[in-house]
UniProtKB/Swiss-Prot annotation:
Coiled coil: none annotated. It is found in: Mitochondrion. The lineage of its organism: Eukaryota, Fungi, Dikarya, Ascomycota, Saccharomycotina. It comes from Saccharomyces cerevisiae (strain ATCC 204508 / S288c) (Baker's yeast). Keywords: Mitochondrion, mRNA processing, mRNA splicing. Appears to be specifically required for the splicing of the terminal intron (bI5) of the cytochrome b pre-mRNA. Can also stimulates the splicing of the omega intron of the precursor of large ribosomal RNA. InterPro entries: Cbp2. GO terms for molecular function: RNA binding. This is Cytochrome B pre-mRNA-processing protein 2. GO terms for cellular component: mitochondrion.
């Protein structure tokens, strides 16, 4: 499992020295770019809208419902804008502003209208979305029989109910209590009779007492109606509820419930629901925004006028399906890491030649390293994935994005290492030759300005990167074909990619050892202070390569990756040359590669024995590293 706080520290140590490139100095501006974009969009006379019905204030929306809205945002046509339709309001009034719009709009990729629309103002073609949303109490006309928890949709659809479905055990009990006659219940909204039906699929009711039968919306509910007349009635629409009818349903309300992506009831006490609100009962947008205030030091300076959690972080948290503050911290780390990757290009704009598609750009020969090919292969795989349309595909898509971002962060660390190693030659170019940095630029600018995944999870940062990099955008004929050729099937390419995967493992473990040495604490209540780099003087990293399989270029690259002195040896006896230092951690990377972290300690410090479990692990790694391969 990725430790995003460790990767955040790795990124923080490699950020630009100038404040103009620092995360906190730019995040408020990046988020606020939403406002002029919205203003510009709503000036259009022929703007198309995505109308989203909502029963209540957007600021108080449940995070599950907001996730559904964001899924619509992901899949809506690019030129559309979003407008909220309030189904709980009927009185006509002047334009009603969305409460805390300036904190909510940055969570959307599409422009979000500042003003809500009343349901009564919509034309007849508009139909609110049908979802199971609550539990209500229903009773017989004489009040003798009651069902305390019946699954029910949005209140506005109550007039469409044609009966109550119950399990066999409940049906038999009610029959017995009513002297053998099938009881008739009453719709709380309009007092119309609701016949009782026995449901064969008891899973749709779960632990509750029953479910409203709505054949107009749920095809499966039509099987309860057998005569031709009754079948015909199921296809006839009923009027949507008036305000008074909805108030009656509100009085009968017995709790909240949700609908899953298949439209089936989703229970709040189910295990999968519990994990989504782990780490605190964060179930509404209001609660998430309020809880995020305690973390404002992470993304803002004291001088910032707006210290609200950036919309990209809130959006990614909700789309992660883990509605916790712990997850919000992780999404902050990812946002920070992506921004710092972007600054590699931003800080070196003067070294990038601009070749637009209209220029007569020369035909360059491209030269790619295996770490270039590896990250490009990961990028191509992410681009080939389908855009998520439901919760299940969203979870899988988000997992892939996180994995790709981890790889991209490793690639950026390798790039920075390469820039330190070849600090002069990396920028050298001429009329027929691309510099090494221009090769890197072609990859990074493509990923940062064209990635579907980055746009989905970090839309504000994505648009900012596009705008900022546009003046120096390199568009070279043959670039894509050239880099694609390095990842095509074939033994040589496959071998290169395996080699790159090995480099990734080495680099990641090196970075984790680096964090173990510096050990800065991830704080949310005050600015994070980095420890001095001179601390690394007391440490050494030894990489045991028994087969001598790590290429020399990899060794040099890894040595420049960190301030910690790093050695490569092919025999364990060579490690003993550093016997004046004491091993404090070790990691087995594969059967022939091991990494050791040494610290210079006095004899008194070493006397404390290691915990028994750590000794066992150390012994296993020791045996494996000493094992002779035949």
């Amino acid at each position: 499992m990725v430790n995003w706080q460790t990767l955040f520290m790795v990124s923080l140590r490699r950020q630009g020295s100038s404040s103009r490139y620092r995360y906190k100095f730019n995040m408020e501006n990046i988020t606020h770019q939403v406002f002029p974009r919205c203003k510009q969009a709503f000036k259009k006379t022929n703007l198309s809208y995505e109308y989203c019905d909502l029963e209540g204030v957007l600021y108080n929306i449940s995070l599950t419902d907001l996730q559904k809205l964001l899924l619509r945002d992901i899949n809506a046509p690019r030129e559309h804008a979003f407008k909220i339709v309030r189904t709980d309001l009927t009185q006509k009034s002047s334009k009603k502003r969305i409460q805390h719009w300036e904190r909510i709009a940055p969570m959307f990729d599409h422009p979000l209208s500042l003003y809500e629309k009343l349901f009564s103002e919509m034309d007849e073609d508009f139909k609110p979305s049908f979802e199971w949303q609550q539990l209500i109490r229903v009773r017989c006309k004489d009040d003798k029989l009651k069902l305390q928890r019946v699954i029910w949709p949005k209140s506005i659809f109550s007039n469409f109910c044609r009966g109550i479905g119950v399990k066999k055990s409940t049906y038999d009990r009610l029959l017995e209590q009513n002297n053998g006659e099938v009881p008739m219940f009453v719709n709380p909204a309009n007092a119309k009779p609701l016949p009782l039906f026995q449901v064969s699929d008891e899973a749709m009711i779960g632990e509750f007492d029953g479910i409203g039968i709505f054949p107009y919306f749920v095809d499966k509910h039509r099987e309860f109606f057998v005569t031709e007349v009754d079948k015909l009635k199921t296809k006839i629409a009923s009027p949507l509820c008036t305000l008074n009818e909805r108030k009656r349903i509100e009085k009968a309300n017995a709790g909240r419930i949700l609908a899953n992506e298949e439209g089936k009831p989703f229970y709040l006490d189910a295990n999968s629901a519990t994990t989504r609100i782990a780490g605190g009962n964060v179930v509404t947008l209001k609660q998430l925004l309020e809880r995020s205030v305690s973390h404002k030091t992470l993304w803002s300076k004291q001088s910032n006028k707006d210290r609200t959690c950036p919309g990209d972080i809130l959006r990614a948290t909700i789309l992660s399906n883990d509605f916790s503050i712990r997850q919000l911290r992780a999404e902050f780390c990812k946002n920070f890491i992506l921004y710092n990757i972007f600054t590699i290009l931003q800080r070196n704009k003067k070294s990038i030649r601009s070749f637009s598609g209209n220029d007569n750009a020369p035909s360059f020969q491209f030269s790619w390293n295996v770490w270039d090919s590896y990250i490009w292969k990961q990028y191509q795989e992410t681009e080939s994935m389908k855009i998520p349309t439901d919760q299940a595909s969203l979870i899988n898509y988000k997992t892939k994005y996180d994995s790709f971002l981890h790889d991209l962060q490793t690639y950026s660390a390798l790039v920075i290492s390469e820039m330190k190693w070849n600090q002069f030659s990396i920028f050298q170019n001429d009329e027929t030759t691309l510099s090494r940095f221009e090769h890197i630029t072609l990859i990074l600018q493509t990923v940062l300005t064209k990635s579907k995944m980055i746009r989905i999870f970090q839309p504000n940062l994505y648009k900012f990167m596009q705008d900022d990099l546009r003046p120096t955008l390199m568009e070279l004929v043959g670039f894509t074909e050239s880099i694609n050729a390095t990842i095509e099937p074939g033994f040589a390419n496959e071998q290169s990619l395996q080699s790159a995967n090995g480099l990734k493992k080495l680099a990641n473990q090196l970075l984790y050892f680096e964090q173990e040495i510096y050990g800065e604490k991830f704080r949310v209540n005050r600015p994070i202070q980095l420890r001095p780099i001179t601390l690394s003087a007391n440490y050494k990293i030894v990489i045991l390569d028994k087969k001598n399989a790590i290429p020399e270029i990899f060794q040099t690259l890894l040595k420049f990756m960190t301030q910690i002195t790093t050695y490569f040896v092919k025999d364990l006896s060579e490690v003993e040359l550093h016997g004046h230092m004491h091993c404090i951690d070790k990691k087995m990377l594969d059967k022939s590669k091991f990494m050791y972290l040494y610290e210079e300690k006095s004899n008194e410090e070493v006397k404390a024995a290691s915990p028994q479990k750590e000794k066992i692990v150390d012994n296993i790694i020791g045996l494996l590293s000493n094992d002779e391969e035949h």
